[in-house]
């Protein structure tokens, strides 16, 4: 990976130069090399709005997923949320309290929440009865 989202947002690369095609068909990744300083400000910038529009136009028949920090850890999610069509809440098994989940849902009250994923759960074999 020579260039990433960092260079794209710094206007040092074009979108097609930072997209990575892993071996999965119809799957593209836009990686980040390092944390973006002042991420809340960056996410509210015209550059990110343009990026989202560009991805919408380029991949109009696909689903675009943005992996963001936890809702309660920063303002990043709240800042960029109005730009998204829908939201999928990811809850880490054993790491989030009921209160934290409820508070996260409160922050997402005006979003088009399409579901919740329980992540980091250990599979358990159970009999039907």
Residue ranges and their predicted role:
Residues 1-129:
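P-loop NTP-binding module
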């Amino acid at each position: 990976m020579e260039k990433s989202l960092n260079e794209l947002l710094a206007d040092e690369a074009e979108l097609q130069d930072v997209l990575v095609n892993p071996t999965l068909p119809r799957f593209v990744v836009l990686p980040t090399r390092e944390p973006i300083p002042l991420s809340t400000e960056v996410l509210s910038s015209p550059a990110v709005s343009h990026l989202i529009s560009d991805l919408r136009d380029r991949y109009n028949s696909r689903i675009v997923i943005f992996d963001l920090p936890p809702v309660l850890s920063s303002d990043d999610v709240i800042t960029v949320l109005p730009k998204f069509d829908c939201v999928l809440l990811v809850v880490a098994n054993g790491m989030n309290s009921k209160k934290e989940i409820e508070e996260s849902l409160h922050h997402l009250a005006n979003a088009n929440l399409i579901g919740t994923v329980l992540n980091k759960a250990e599979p358990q074999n159970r009999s039907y009865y």
